[in-house]
A protein has these predicted regions:
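Glycine/proline-rich, positively charged
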Residues: 93-187, 194
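Conserved small/polar residues in nucleotide/adenosyl-binding loops
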Residues: 287-294
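Short, well-ordered coil/turn segments that N-cap beta-strands
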Residues: 13-14, 46-48, 77-80, 123-127, ...
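Active-site beta-loop-alpha junctions enriched in small/polar residues
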Residues: 20-22, 55, 85-89, 131-134, ...
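Basic phosphate/pyrophosphate-binding loop/patch that engages nucleotide-derived ligands
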Residues: 151-152, 195-205
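Glycine-rich, positively charged active-site loop/lid region within alpha/beta enzyme cores that binds
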Residues: 92-99, 200-258, 275-281
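Conserved, mostly hydrophobic/aromatic
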Residues: 17, 35, 50, 69, ...
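N-terminal binding-site loop/beta-alpha segment at the start of enzyme catalytic domains
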Residues: 1-81
């Protein structure tokens, strides 16, 4: 797997491992053995970039993902780039599967969160630390200032923003240079292409989450009933309703034809498309059954 540069100097594999699905949002939780097998396979195929967040977990174990990775990634820590996120919590009063997020970008929250993440991840620093969502009640300059302090203390080496607008990016970058923006991006969701000019101007990388549209672009799902496991966020996503699947059927059929012509899979075609867009785009992907597909792209 080739290397890409986020920001000015953060070297990562061109496809990262989005670890959320091992603990959160897809209806199943990986055992340590399953996680070890997936991560070992990813590393063997050249993946060096692993993405998590303090909020990825279960009701019983809210920080499951970081704790799991703290055990599984420990033997590889000096060989990988480890990213995590802070600054949101779930609205536990909600009864929906996909609970609303409550942003919290206060400096005191960020400083408390990094200590918990470092402990759970069994490391003395993070290579990339994001504010997970933008808290519009806190000036972004204060959030950026807290990240700058963490960098000066050696607790993080780079920082980033998730789901940020151009205005927020520019204001944050003035306080402390931003290395990466992590936003939703795929063939099915291209709104953030409008940020590409400012990212190029400021030399900021773009990390794409949900690059396979939460699995839609694998062309493997055909019925809403496939997402009925408790905690599977896809049960509430419009693209996975019976109507949504029907509307996208023609596109998925076309993807299958293209994939067959290239002796590839729809997932590989999707990732190859993304990697060809810009040299500073790095998709982070997770699929239990497609760990090989996402790294063996075209």
């Amino acid at each position: 797997m080739e290397i890409r540069i986020l920001g000015r100097d953060l070297e990562v594999s061109e496809i990262g491992f989005g670890c959320m699905g091992m603990s959160h949002a897809y209806g199943t939780v990986s055992t340590q053995k399953e996680a070890e097998e997936l991560i070992e396979k990813a590393i063997d195929e050249g993946c060096t970039f692993f993405d998590t967040a303090e909020i990825y977990g279960t009701t019983e174990d809210p920080h499951h993902n970081e704790k799991l990775l703290g055990k599984v990634l420990r033997p590889y820590r000096n060989k990988i780039v480890l990213a995590s996120k802070c600054g949101i919590r779930f609205d536990e009063t909600a009864t929906t599967v996909n609970k609303p997020l409550i942003p919290d970008g206060r400096p005191e929250t960020i400083k408390a969160s990094i200590e918990g993440s470092l402990m759970r991840l069994n490391t003395d620093h993070l290579d990339l630390y994001y504010i997970h969502r933008i808290d519009m009640t806190v000036p972004i300059e204060e959030t950026a200032g807290a990240m700058k302090e963490l960098m000066e203390q050696g607790k993080i080496t780079h920082w980033g923003l998730s789901e940020a607008s151009e205005e927020i990016i520019r204001r944050a970058h003035k306080v402390c240079p931003v290395t990466a923006i992590q936003n939703r991006y795929s063939m099915m969701y291209r709104d953030y292409e409008k940020l590409f000019p400012v990212l190029e101007e400021l030399k900021i990388g773009f990390v794409a989450f949900s690059p396979l549209a939460n699995g839609l672009l694998t062309a493997a799902y055909h019925s809403h009933g496939e997402f009925e496991k408790p905690g599977d966020y896809r049960s509430a996503m419009p693209q996975f309703t019976e109507e949504g699947l029907k509307e996208n059927n023609e596109f998925m059929s076309w993807m299958k034809v293209i994939a067959e012509e290239k002796n590839a899979t729809p997932a590989q075609i999707s990732l190859a498309w993304m990697l060809a867009k810009k040299p500073y785009i790095v998709p982070v992907s997770y699929t239990h059954l497609r760990a090989h597909e996402t790294s063996a792209h075209l």
